[in-house]
């Protein structure tokens, strides 16, 4: 499946909730879901009742879009989560949260996950002192993510760091704003994921 390149706001309207795909805009009255709270398209205002399968599919699509993944990537994460000990749905969320691009976003270096993914790809960060450019790297407890010296004057990054208080930093992460770095204090647990996600629906879908 090719990566979606259309308007991000259409995805929020499709899932009938804010996915926070456009950074600061999502916190303002300009957010599309606040102005047009119905699906996109000619017949969008006539919402239909979904079947059990349809509900599961929509939940999977919602989670996939929140983290900006293609179907094959997402299915791979589910397969890995299913092999791990513990609850599959919670394992899945933990794997998604520990992606490097998501950690960069959670620490406040970017206003959206798509922006954080681009920053990582362009080599603006180091992981444990080594330059990295792979957004999907799985971070571990004790890992240190630091903004490279040459990137510390980028306006968008500083604006995002100044605004992070509005979103908050999860308890499993720690940010040193003055040093432009953060670290993983612990593994994320289910309670750390505050986005309304029903991961069990995803498990049920892939278990068919």
Curated annotation (Swiss-Prot):
Keyword terms: Ribonucleoprotein, Ribosomal protein, RNA-binding, rRNA-binding
Keyword Acetylation: no
Domain S4 RNA-binding: 98-159
GO cellular component, one term: small ribosomal subunit
PROSITE patterns: RIBOSOMAL_S4, S4
Superkingdom of origin: Bacteria
GO biological process, one term: ribosomal small subunit biogenesis
Any one Pfam family match given in the protein's UniProt record, by short name: S4
GO molecular function: rRNA binding; structural constituent of ribosome
Function: One of the primary rRNA binding proteins, it binds directly to 16S rRNA where it nucleates assembly of the body of the 30S subunit.
Family, as annotated: Belongs to the universal ribosomal protein uS4 family.
UniProt subunit comment: Part of the 30S ribosomal subunit. Contacts protein S5. The interaction surface between S4 and S5 is involved in control of translational fidelity.
Identification of the protein by name: Small ribosomal subunit protein uS4
Organism: Pelobacter propionicus (strain DSM 2379 / NBRC 103807 / OttBd1)
Gene: rpsD
